[in-house]
Amino acid sequence: RTGYLTSGNALLNKFFDNVIWGQRGNFLDVPTDCPQRDERLGWTGDAQIFAKTACYQYDAEKFFTKWMADLALSARLDGSVPVVVPDVLDLSGACGWADAAVIVPWEVYRAFGDAQIIRDSFSCMKGHLDYIRNTTSAPDLWRVESVPHYGDWLALDHDEGSYRGATPLAYTCDCYYAYSL
């Protein structure tokens, strides 16, 4: 463990402890989304959003290096990246989730300063960006209508009966595309 936080606020301290325990429960062989349910899948969106925090809390460089190798093996020939690694759902290319191909190696590099993960992941990173460029219907934007994007997933401002937040899907995808570039 590398990251510690103690404050004068018991609620904040408990929150931080819960984040630590969440990482312990979810980082076994792949970064899973939740250990308490039968699902326990390696959702790429969960991994990319948590990678920076994971690297602050633990020496997660080897863990993510191994997982990025798994991700690269799961990537499709067209460069699209699965939403789950290992790919047991046969779904790929969703914005935010597929961007794990770029965001995870970048955050690991930023945390530990070793560019090897970038070198090892470069082909997959480039493949992901090429996939967007080759399949988009609008130059310089991420408009891949054939892919079921999740968007602003589990936002509090979602419509009744939906898990997708009110943030426009095109905006979310464009922001991820810009960040990944």
Segments predicted by a language model, with ranges:
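Active-site acid/base region of carbohydrate-active enzymes
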Residues: 2-18, 24-25, 31-49, 53-83, ...
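Hydrophobic alpha-helical segments typical of transmembrane helices
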Residues: 67, 104-105
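TPR repeat positional signature
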Residues: 105, 174, 178-181
